[in-house]
Amino acid sequence: MGLSDGEWQLVLNVWGKVEGDLSGHGQEVLIRLFKGHPETLEKFDKFKHLKAEDEMRASEELKKHGTTVLTALGGILKKKGQHAAELAPLAQSHATKHKIPVKYLEFISEAIIQVLQSKHPGDFGADAQGAMSKALELFRNDIAAKYKELGFQG
């Protein structure tokens, strides 16, 4: 289920746009995640109290965490599927400490796609969307495999 060189190029081209405003993109991704799937908010002790979108937008902690999430994801995407070293600590913390189910990674993947569609319609056409979906699925599948190795049934 690997991506072609052309698909990776599409992914990295749009990711360059994301890196121009990591905090803005990250904040938007988390807001979409929490609004679309409120149950995910329960996994974040420091954000549980944020119920309204305006509260989320005003939270510097949420913006900071969004930056952290997208920085980590960008590092993984740039490895073009050769991301085992980057993935291992992420899988470890998300399985053992945070206990984030794979389903929630699907939810955040959807939010990422939606944010990219919204913010970069000219650079995120059908081909780029398909490539990004494949890249995020590869990431999720590899995380799920690591979860299994760790005995986490997320």
From Swiss-Prot:
Gene of this entry: MB
GO CC terms for this protein?
A: extracellular exosome; sarcoplasm
In which residues is nitrite bound? 65
Where along this sequence does the record place binding of O2? 65
Look up and give the organism this protein is from: Proechimys guairae (Guaira spiny rat)
* EC number assigned by the record: 1.7.-.-, 1.11.1.-
Family, similarity comment:
Belongs to the globin family.
Question: Which UniProt keywords are present, listed alphabetically?
Answer: Cytoplasm, Heme, Iron, Metal-binding, Muscle protein, Oxidoreductase, Oxygen transport, Phosphoprotein, Transport
Instruction: Name the GO terms of the biological process aspect.
Output: removal of superoxide radicals
Q: Where in this chain does the record put each Globin domain?
A: 2-148
- Is Transport one of the keywords? yes
Give residues where Phosphothreonine occurs: 68
| Entries under Pfam families matching the protein | Globin (PF00042)
Name the UniProt record assigns to this protein: Myoglobin
